[in-house]
Swiss-Prot record:
The keyword DNA-binding is assigned to this record: no
Function: Located at the top of the head of the 30S subunit, it contacts several helices of the 16S rRNA. In the 70S ribosome it contacts the 23S rRNA (bridge B1a) and protein L5 of the 50S subunit (bridge B1b), connecting the 2 subunits; these bridges are implicated in subunit movement. Contacts the tRNAs in the A and P-sites.
Protein name in UniProt: Small ribosomal subunit protein uS13
Subunit composition and interactions: Part of the 30S ribosomal subunit. Forms a loose heterodimer with protein S19. Forms two bridges to the 50S subunit in the 70S ribosome.
Family to which the UniProt record says this protein belongs: Belongs to the universal ribosomal protein uS13 family.
Region (Disordered): 92-118
Gene from which this protein is expressed: rpsM
Biological processes, Gene Ontology terms: translation
Entry-linked Pfam families: Ribosomal_S13
MF terms in GO: rRNA binding; structural constituent of ribosome; tRNA binding
Amino acid sequence: MARIAGVNIPDNKHAVISLTYIFGIGRHTAKNILAAVGITETTKIRELDDAQLDAIRAEVAKVPTEGDLRREISMNIKRLMDLGCYRGLRHRRSLPVRGQRTKTNARTRKGPRKPIKK
């Protein structure tokens, strides 16, 4: 297994699919990375030599991935909560942020039902 950005990616899959095992890299970004390096999408990781893997690592390093991306996302949410804007309040109260209804749905976000205490 090749190791890119701290993630073991599978050898027996196509390069595009293997790169998507890295948090922050989807199919579109994986295709762009492979095009920049000059590798076809259907090439399997085990068929690549060390120079090509190093080139892929260099391209992946330009994209925020794994821990850096997770930290950036959590800092963005924290910033919204500190501002006190509507989206920040919804995050703070663990309610849907993007305008979904909450009268009957949103059980995943709100958690299990709490019984009414008499």
